[in-house]
Amino acid sequence: MTRAETKERNRRALLDAAFHVVSRDGHRARLDEIAERAGLTTGAVYSLFGSKSGLLGALVTDYLQPHYEEIEQAIPADADLLGAVDAFARYYRRTCDAADAPADQSLQFTLLDMALHDAEVGPRLAASVRAEESRLIALFAGRPHEGALVTQGQAHRLTTALRAVLIGLSQGVLLGLAPGADEQYFADTARALVSGATLLEEPGAGAGRA
C-alpha cells in the first residue's frame, strides 16, 4: 500500500469512527475514543485534520457530499427555476423515507448541539455547510424565471430559505408531526417561496416601495 493509500485509509477510518462516536456522545465525544475506535492515535487526527474541529468539519462535508451529488442528479439541467425548486423539494421529501433517515436526523441534531457547546467547532461546521451549500446555489443560479435569469445573489437568498423550510418539514415528518406532508406538499411549499418574487429580490431592491 502506498503512502497516499495509507493516508486515505486512515482518514476514512477516522471519519467512520467520528460518525459513530459523535452520533452517540454528542458534544461529549472524546478525540482519544474516536482515534481508538479507528485503530489509530490522536496524533493521526492532528496530522490529517489539524484539530478536533477540523475532523468534525470534514465529517460534515463527508456527510453532505453524497446528498448534494444526488440533488445534482435529481434536478434537470434544462428546468426553469420553478421546475428546479420542485425537483429539489421532491427529492428532499423522498429522503425522509430512506432507511437511514432517522440516523441522519440524529446526526444533524448532534452536530447542532456540538456547534452550540463548542466555540471552535461552531464556525468550522458552519464553514463546511456553506461550502457544500454553494453547490446548491450554483444549481439555481442562471435558470430562467419570469423572463430573466436568476442571479447568484438571488439563488443564495432562495437557497437559505429553501433549506430552512425543508429541513423543518423533514424533521416534522420524521417526528410524526407532519403526517400529511407528502411530495406534493413539499413541492407546493417550496414553489411558494419563489412565487411573488419578493424573496428573489436583491437586498435593498424593494427599499423604495411604498
Predicted regions span which residues?
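Hydrophobic/aromatic-rich alpha-helical bundle segments in the mid-to-C-terminal region
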Residues: 3, 122-126, 130, 145-210
